[in-house]
Curated annotation (Swiss-Prot):
Species annotation: Encephalitozoon cuniculi (strain GB-M1) (Microsporidian parasite)
Region listing for Disordered, in residue ranges: 305-331
Protein name: UPF0329 protein ECU01_0080/ECU01_1530/ECU02_1560/ECU04_0090/ECU08_0010/ECU08_2090
Segments of skewed composition (Basic and acidic residues): 305-320
Protein family: Belongs to the UPF0329 family.
């Protein structure tokens, strides 16, 4: 079954970074059973890049440093949660209380820890984003990490709601009620699927590392030309006025088949996955990347590598001939 996950957009309110519930559904994603929202390690303010994957805390100056530090300390974990998981739990007051009891403090603690480490100056932003994913979706060997426990609690809560459907309503209303909550329950099963949680973390690492390498390879002007307008920015433009966009910090993301991405990395290596990520940054939709497209990209990368090797050989040949001539002349 296909699923809808609501994204969470971060906006500035009175100069303070704040999660804005009214923008919760600014960007919605339709996911297949192996698809997942992956967050790019770039932070945007308005139409400009505020933080690159390679940005360290010491690279930030003045107001930008304060705003980014505030975002990391108060918002980063909640932003990742709402991108990756969506609004599964927020369908009634009891589910919302369960989130507040089990997840809210947990996410705040992770944000505070990630902010403290980032401000230590050694980590790049991409590395901090990886760490946040690892800490939120950690799965120990026993398969009973915090999110897994929360997922099981949500499932129990939903099972009770389905079993004890509304009393004084028609049979048709009960049927619709049970069908709706059964779908929500199916979506919530993601939270205690340790295999899927591990895929989320592994895929995020691949994307973060690829973005970091792309940034290290390109000049700033080239990088600005590389980044296409993403889904979150498009959604913001449709929902929010220009002034609010210019003041807000937000992350970009895409939907990708994590199984295919991980398979591509194992089969073809980092050069191919880096090219796949580059194409997504250029505007290729992650959900359009299938095996056929991956093989096409792999062939292009292989041909490029072959051409570069031939070029290096041609450039080295004259030097080799000169060295050979010198050796012969000295005999």
């Amino acid at each position: 079954m296909r699923r809808i996950y609501a994204a969470w957009t971060l906006v500035a309110a009175a100069g303070v970074m704040d999660c804005s519930p009214r923008l919760e559904k600014a960007a919605a994603f339709t996911l297949g059973p192996d698809s997942q929202v992956i967050v790019f390690p770039f932070m945007f303010q308005g139409y400009n890049i505020a933080v690159l994957p390679t940005t360290k805390y010491g690279d930030l100056k003045g107001n930008a440093r304060r705003r980014v530090a505030s975002f990391l300390e108060h918002n980063i974990s909640h932003a990742v949660w709402y991108f990756v998981v969506g609004g599964i739990a927020y369908k009634d007051d009891r589910s919302e209380r369960l989130f507040s009891e089990m997840m809210d403090g947990y996410l705040k603690k992770i944000s505070a820890g990630a902010s403290k480490v980032y401000k230590g100056g050694r980590k790049m932003f991409s590395e901090s984003l990886e760490t946040v994913h690892e800490m939120i979706f950690e799965c120990n060997k026993a398969g009973d990490g915090h999110v897994v426990k929360y997922g099981k609690s949500i499932i129990n809560r939903l099972s009770d709601m389905i079993e004890n459907a509304l009393g004084e309503v028609s049979a048709e209303e009960k049927r619709k009620y049970r069908r709706f909550w059964s779908r929500v329950k199916e979506r919530a099963g993601f939270l205690y699927s340790t295999e899927r949680l591990r895929r989320v973390v592994e895929a995020e690492k691949i994307v973060c590392n690829a973005c970091k390498e792309i940034c290290l390879e390109l000049e700033e002007e080239e990088l600005m030309g590389l980044l296409a307008e993403g889904s979150v920015r498009k959604a913001l433009k449709a929902k929010v006025d220009e002034d609010e966009i210019s003041r807000g910090l937000y992350l970009e993301c895409t939907v990708v088949n994590t199984s295919l991405l991980l398979d591509a990395h194992r089969e073809h290596g980092g050069d191919v996955t880096r090219e796949l990520v580059k194409q997504m940054l250029l505007g290729k939709k992650g959900e359009e990347i299938d095996r056929r497209y991956i093989n096409k990209v792999a062939n292009v990368v292989k041909e490029r590598q072959r051409s570069e090797m031939e070029k290096r050989d041609r450039e080295q040949d004259p030097e080799r001939r000169r060295l050979r001539a010198r050796r012969v002349g000295s005999l």
